[in-house]
């Protein structure tokens, strides 16, 4: 309790030299530079009053250093200039032109005793590494190498979003929020795209024109950061604080109470709903587990790869931005938005120190502004009318509607082969839907368009416009399938039946062993296995053991019974006891499960042959393997919900019967926070909805089940089958 407050210490211990600017400042501070000339007022940050570093534009039209604005918004929620409300995730990186102007500012080398070089700001770091005698004299290069070997990226050189303080994490994350090819003036993210640290030579620092020596700080700046540090310390001590304590605070807390668990940042808000976002995650060990579970894949109605569960001690939890239900669209630039489950898992398991993910958090219950925006996003042909006739009110049109990030309105993303729209032949991909049955959708949403289509009896009147010239690919925000949640084949794809992800067949194996000899295998699963009830399965086979010598029982086999004793509903402890007590003659009934290899094309760089096969000791069952097991092995549970005042149960379903794809199970795709399904806590993404109030969902079409769920009142019993997602 008598520990001094570091923020108030008049003589703090010197910080290590920064390899970007050559100054000794803490990771919470911007870089310091000495400029040869006065900086133009338009390139000055209105918070620190110095040249912009990593400039960030607010919606109200002002520009600040990313770190300055992030620190300011820790306590405030408005723009410092005009005091209009500002949310960090709504801010955008400044244009390439602004960044180029900043990078060309002339600065002097801070090591004036050894070097008198004058060079552009963006070249200073390279100068330190290659030709600066001062940097060598002060051990800057050695210090950088030592920090790299120690796996410590906080030497003021890199604002990595996952390893530094939460203020820097938020700042770095903003630079990754856009991934928008085709824009005339995209956000400046060259360092992110090139795979370099965010605060590299392209990311510049703050001016320090008044300082003659390289290690001095102005009194005003010190006072400013003391206030910020005190505010952050207060946040760390509150239950609602969403930031993680720094290394000094952690060490002090651990010395006082060793039982306090490690606190991870809660930075969920940095990924906005309904927008495709790119993030970068660092791992000191390239092979460190992500500690998440994944569901989904193109062979299921979920289509996308979705995070089912995040474990508290893993890389993703330490990063603090992702949530269960988030959709992973790309992995290190590789598109996995519509690939088989096992293919996506193989990509995510590739060792790498920097993992780049493009993710989508679906928009939930957010009303969109209908303010008028000029329709000037590119020339389009005159609008035309399309009338589609449904054979029944429940029939789907067979189109997928999405919204674009850079243009308002509703757009056709895909037309399902054989659907109503496809048979009519007039609608095409990228068409913009201006109106449905007289309702203006020029600034509408795909959700409202879907409601209008579903409310139509038989005749759907659409007003559509078509762009004159195809633009470069746009990024879409998904709104769900109009055609029952099932993805249609892309252009040129063959509409062939999908192969099962795994095949099963039963086998009976008899082995002999000495009375004191072990069978030589390790099993997992069992009733009440952590959070799931699972069959007993073989994790590994000991080389040279009884099972290994016989060769018929393999890793991944499901054990059904031993000498006539059923293992389908026993715990792992009970199963091990039964196996150990078996006599010399052992008869094993097992289910062999063979998973199909993903046949996707992939480059050698993306999937190195050395990493394609999981080591036997690290084998774990995949989510798609569980889906292919016979129904009698499926442990079902009843979840009782009561509809809340908003009238929503709080989950989204995909799947069901379709004329062209047959019968598919209904999967839970997403769960809305604060709803009955969320509050109950037993329903997860990827769960299968088998029955509602005792009525089986098998063979139902999507519209029928959705209507039934909306009309049910009071106590609702859902029969759920839940399997654990693939662990990474």
Swiss-Prot record:
Family annotation (CDD domains): mRING-HC-C3HC3D_LNX1, PDZ1_LNX1_2-like, PDZ2_LNX1_2-like, PDZ3_LNX1_2-like, PDZ4_LNX1_2-like
Record pathway: Protein modification; protein ubiquitination
Protein purpose: E3 ubiquitin-protein ligase that mediates ubiquitination and subsequent proteasomal degradation of NUMB. E3 ubiquitin ligases accept ubiquitin from an E2 ubiquitin-conjugating enzyme in the form of a thioester and then directly transfers the ubiquitin to targeted substrates. Mediates ubiquitination of isoform p66 and isoform p72 of NUMB, but not that of isoform p71 or isoform p65. Isoform 2 provides an endocytic scaffold for IGSF5/JAM4.
GO molecular function terms attached to this record: identical protein binding; PDZ domain binding; ubiquitin-protein transferase activity; zinc ion binding
Zn-finger (RING-type) residues: 45-83
Species, as recorded: Mus musculus (Mouse)
Catalytic activity: S-ubiquitinyl-[E2 ubiquitin-conjugating enzyme]-L-cysteine + [acceptor protein]-L-lysine = [E2 ubiquitin-conjugating enzyme]-L-cysteine + N(6)-ubiquitinyl-[acceptor protein]-L-lysine
Effect of residue 182 to A: Slightly affects binding to NUMB protein
Record-level GO BP terms: protein ubiquitination; synapse maturation; ubiquitin-dependent protein catabolic process
Protein name per UniProt: E3 ubiquitin-protein ligase LNX
Record note on what altering residue 183 to A does: Abolishes binding to NUMB protein
Outcome of substituting residue 188 to F: No effect on binding to NUMB protein
Limits of the PDZ domain: 278-362, 385-467, 508-593, 638-723
EC id: 2.3.2.27
Region Disordered: start-end pairs: 185-220, 481-500
Effect the entry attributes to changing residue 188 to A: Abolishes binding to NUMB protein
């Amino acid at each position: 309790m008598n520990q001094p407050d570091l923020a108030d210490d008049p003589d703090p211990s010197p910080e290590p030299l920064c390899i970007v600017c050559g100054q000794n400042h803490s990771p919470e501070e911007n870089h310091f530079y000495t400029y040869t000339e006065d900086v133009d007022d338009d390139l000055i940050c209105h918070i620190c009053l110095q040249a912009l570093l990593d400039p960030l534009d607010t919606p109200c039209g002002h520009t600040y250093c990313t770190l300055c604005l992030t620190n300011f918004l820790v306590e405030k929620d408005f723009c410092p200039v005009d005091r209009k409300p500002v949310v960090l995730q709504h801010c955008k990186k400044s244009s390439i032109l602004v960044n180029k102007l900043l990078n060309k500012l002339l600065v002097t080398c801070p090591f004036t005793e050894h070097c008198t070089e004058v060079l552009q700001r963006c070249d200073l770091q390279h100068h330190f590494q290659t030709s600066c005698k001062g940097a060598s004299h002060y051990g800057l290069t050695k210090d950088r190498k030592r920090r790299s070997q120690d796996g410590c990226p906080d030497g003021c050189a890199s604002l990595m979003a996952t390893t530094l303080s939460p203020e820097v994490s938020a700042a770095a994350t903003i630079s990754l929020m856009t991934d928008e090819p085709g824009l005339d003036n995209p956000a400046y993210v060259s360092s992110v795209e090139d795979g370099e640290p965010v605060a590299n030579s392209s990311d510049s620092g703050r001016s320090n024109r008044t300082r003659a020596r390289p290690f001095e700080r102005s009194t005003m700046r010190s006072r400013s950061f003391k206030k910020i540090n005190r505010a952050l310390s207060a946040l760390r001590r509150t239950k609602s604080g969403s930031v993680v304590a720094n290394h000094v605070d952690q060490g002090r807390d651990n010395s006082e109470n060793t039982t306090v668990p490690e606190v991870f940042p809660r930075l969920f808000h940095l990924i906005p709903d309904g927008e495709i976002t790119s993030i970068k995650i660092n791992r000191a060990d390239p092979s460190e587990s992500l500690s998440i579970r994944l569901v989904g894949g193109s062979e299921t109605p979920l289509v996308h790869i979705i995070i089912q569960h995040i474990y508290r001690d893993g890389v993703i939890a330490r990063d603090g931005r992702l949530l269960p239900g988030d959709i992973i669209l790309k992995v290190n630039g590789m598109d996995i938005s519509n690939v088989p489950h096992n293919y996506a898992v193989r990509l995510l398991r590739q060792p790498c120190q920097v993992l780049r993910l493009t993710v989508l958090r679906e928009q939930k219950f957010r009303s969109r502004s209908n303010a008028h925006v000029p329709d000037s996003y590119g020339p389009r042909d005159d609008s035309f009318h399309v009338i589609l006739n449904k054979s029944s009110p429940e029939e789907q049109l067979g189109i997928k509607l999405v919204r674009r990030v850079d243009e308002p309105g509703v757009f056709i993303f895909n037309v399902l082969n054989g659907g109503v729209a496809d048979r009519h032949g007039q609608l095409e991909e990228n068409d913009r839907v201006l109106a449905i049955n007289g309702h203006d959708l020029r600034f509408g949403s795909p959700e409202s368009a879907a409601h209008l289509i579903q409310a139509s009896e038989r005749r759907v009147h659409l007003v559509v416009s078509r762009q004159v010239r195809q633009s470069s690919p746009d990024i879409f925000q998904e709104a769900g399938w109009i055609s029952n949640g099932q993805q249609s084949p892309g252009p040129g794809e063959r509409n062939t039946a999908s192969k099962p992800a795994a095949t099963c067949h039963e086998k009976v194996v008899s082995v002999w062993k000495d009375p004191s000899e072990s069978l030589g295998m390790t099993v997992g699963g069992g009733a009440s296995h952590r959070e799931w009830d699972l069959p007993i399965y073989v994790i590994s086979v000991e080389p040279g053991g009884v099972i290994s010598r016989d060769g018929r029982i393999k890793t991944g086999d499901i054990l059904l019974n031993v000498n006539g004793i059923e293992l389908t509903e026993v715990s792992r402890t009970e199963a091990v006891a039964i196996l150990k007590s078996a006599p010399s003659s052992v008869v094993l009934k097992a289910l062999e499960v063979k998973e199909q290899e993903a046949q996707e094309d992939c480059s050698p760089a993306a999937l190195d042959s050395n990493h394609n096969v999981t080591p036997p000791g690290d084998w774990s069952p995949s989510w798609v393997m569980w889906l292919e097991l016979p129904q009698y092995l499926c442990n079902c549970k009843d979840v009782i919900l009561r509809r809340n005042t908003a009238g929503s149960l709080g989950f989204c379903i995909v799947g069901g019967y379709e004329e062209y794809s047959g019968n598919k199970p209904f999967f839970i795709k997403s769960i809305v926070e604060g709803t009955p399904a969320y509050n109950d806590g037993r329903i997860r993404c990827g769960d299968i909805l088998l029955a509602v109030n005792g009525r089986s969902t098998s063979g139902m079409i999507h519209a029928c089940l959705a209507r039934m769920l909306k009309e049910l009142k009071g106590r609702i019993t859902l029969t759920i089958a839940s399997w654990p997602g693939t662990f990474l």
